Structures are given as structure tokens and as C-alpha cells.
């Protein structure tokens, strides 16, 4: 019930955002006879797929976030929890991977962004949740098999969705200068920032208060598959921090 409540709150927040800032049912008083048309750079079949795939990945990570908040509220987390979270994380990761790949291919043949990857702030905004989502995916495997890394997995669930919201804010707010920015709006960016502060600030506060109460799980040998996955997690987390600081 708590998981569905968190998901409902996220959906309600973005529904309010759409109604207040981009109401699709708002009547135009003096509509222009002809529109300006789409930016020629965006008139591409790949662009009908690239943004939806990215946002399916972002939204998918909200499920892991909701499960993490539910675990913190009830103070209970186990291998069954990881078994529920891992498929959603994998699905979100696949969508985000396909979205990034499609965007890279489009950037390559448009010859405008410096090749496949230019380390542009908007590109980095999608890479950061992908890196953290990869770490979360590996962490849930360790938790499901060994009942370990409970607190770390919950934290990764919160941070992955945090970076998804942060990426949305950076792209839409106009805070950063990017050749990828086609629809920046500071007003809408502030609304997204408010959503980010509410959910992520609340999630991290709840984590700080409730994480010590989570029962620690099993142990595993440092030289093992699980140990390698932990090293992988640390590398991905460090890479995310490096990209964030560079952005």
C-alpha cells in the first residue's frame, strides 16, 4: 500500500505540473493560422522514439524509489523485496539504454554534436541515472542471492530516481547551456525543482532516520562474484560523481 501511495503521489505531482504549466486543454484566444513548424534538426523519425524511451527509463526508476520508501516506512527489507524491485529496475534500465543509444546514433548522423558522444550537460543528465541504475541492478542481485547490501541498495534506489529528476530539471530549466536544449523554460524548471526537493529531500531524510533500523543481512567472501559486484558498484558510483562534478 505504501508503494502505491508513493507512486500515486509522484503521478499526482506531475499531473499538477502539466495542468498548471502546460495545460493541453487550454484554449488559445487568437490562434495563428499557421504554425512555425518543427526545428529541422528535430524532424527525424528517431526523435519520435528517443525522448519517450528516455522518460520511460526515468519513470521506471520511480518504482524502485517507491519500494525503497516503503521499506524505510515499514523498517523491513529482504530478498523478496529485491525480487520485486529487480525486474522493474531492469526494465527501466533497458528503456534508458535504448534511449541513450538512439540519441547517440541520431547525434552521429546529424553531425552536429561532435560524434556519438560529446559529454554535453544534457547527455550527462541521462548518463548519470544510467550509471547509478546499473549499480542498483547489480546490488539487487547481491541482495536477492545473499540477503546483503540492504542499506546500500535502498540508498541506490533513492539516488537513481533523484538523478532522473535532476536530469529532467537540468534539461528543462535552462540552468545549463547546452546545444541539446530545445524547450527550456525557467518557470517549469522551478516547478520540477520543487518536485525534486519534496520527494528526494523527503526520501533522503527518511533514509537518514530509518536506515539504521534495517536489519543487516548475510555476509560473503571478499573474493567472490558478490565482492566483484561491490567493486563494480563503487566504480559506477565514483563515475557518477565525476560526471556530476564535470557537468
Regions flagged by a language model, labelled:
Residues 1-246:
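Polytopic transmembrane helical bundles with strong interfacial aromatic enrichment
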Amino acid at each position: 500500500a505504501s508503494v502505491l501511495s508513493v507512486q500515486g503521489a509522484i503521478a499526482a505531482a506531475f499531473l499538477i505540473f502539466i495542468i498548471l504549466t502546460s495545460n493541453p486543454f487550454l484554449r488559445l484566444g487568437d490562434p495563428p493560422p499557421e504554425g512555425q513548424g518543427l526545428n529541422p534538426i528535430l524532424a527525424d523519425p528517431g526523435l519520435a522514439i528517443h525522448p519517450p524511451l528516455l522518460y520511460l527509463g526515468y519513470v521506471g526508476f520511480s518504482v524502485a524509489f517507491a519500494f525503497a520508501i516503503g521499506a524505510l516506512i515499514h523498517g523491513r527489507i529482504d530478498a523478496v523485496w529485491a525480487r520485486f524491485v529487480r525486474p522493474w529496475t531492469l526494465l527501466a534500465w533497458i528503456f534508458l539504454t535504448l534511449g541513450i543509444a538512439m540519441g547517440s546514433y541520431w547525434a552521429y548522423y546529424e553531425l552536429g554534436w561532435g560524434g556519438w558522444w560529446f559529454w554535453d550537460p544534457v547527455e550527462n543528465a541521462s548518463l548519470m541515472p544510467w550509471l547509478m541504475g546499473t549499480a542498483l541492478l547489480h546490488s539487487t542481485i547481491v541482495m536477492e542471492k545473499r540477503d546483503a547490501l540492504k542499506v546500500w541498495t535502498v540508498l541506490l534506489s533513492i539516488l537513481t530516481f533523484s538523478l532522473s529528476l535532476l536530469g529532467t530539471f537540468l534539461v528543462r530549466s535552462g540552468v545549463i547551456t547546452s546545444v541539446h536544449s530545445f524547450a527550456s523554460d525557467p518557470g517549469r524548471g522551478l516547478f520540477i525543482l520543487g518536485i525534486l526537493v519534496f520527494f528526494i529531500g523527503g526520501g533522503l531524510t527518511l533514509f537518514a532516520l530509518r536506515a539504521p533500523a534495517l536489519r543487516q543481512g548475510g555476509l560473503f567472501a571478499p573474493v567472490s562474484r558478490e565482492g566483484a559486484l561491490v567493486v563494480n558498484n563503487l566504480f559506477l558510483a565514483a563515475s557518477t560523481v565525476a560526471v556530476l562534478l564535470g557537468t
